[in-house]
Amino acid sequence: MFVNWDRGSYYDDVLCFNMQQLIDMKVDSKEAFSLVMTHETCHRVLQNTQFYGPNNGAWEQELCCDYFMGVRAGLWNMDVSKVAMGLITTPGSQTHPEGTLRALFIRYGKYHVKEVQQQGIPLTIQNLITEFDKYRLQILPDIQKEQRKYFRF
């Protein structure tokens, strides 16, 4: 979990985790833990990035961090199966998408990053956010279908 005490500051951020939650999600290897920390670190990097969507884009930021987790896994040839399987059964809420959507974005990031490299697109944070958003728009009807369980729009 990423805690930001002051939205405008990078100097007061805290990165922490819940061991029981990690155990419940089957995060039982250094590689899986590293991917979870990639997701949490992504929240820090994106803390001042505005995403479109209900609840100030809370789901979209979660999915973007999941995508970045997948990107890292693709670049370093890391296994995402434990993290993805641990997330698949997690319920959604107003702040977090259901696990099936999250696993989808992790897997997409892992395999899509190779295409991005082959196209010669520099792997900058902004370019990867753009690539994430292209995919988000492709499957927006599926995302909104899930969001309707938690939001009225």
Feature locations, PLM:
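C-terminal capping/extension segments of zinc metalloprotease domains
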Residues: 1-14, 19-25, 74-153
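Short pre-active-site segment immediately N-terminal to the catalytic Zn-binding motif
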Residues: 19-35, 52-57
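Active-site metal-coordination segments of metallo-dependent hydrolases
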Residues: 51-68, 91-96
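Extracytoplasmic/secreted proteins, especially bacterial periplasmic and envelope-associated proteins
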Residues: 32, 36-40, 60-71, 101, ...
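Phosphate-binding glycine-rich loops and adjacent basic patches that engage nucleotide phosphates
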Residues: 1-6, 26-36, 68
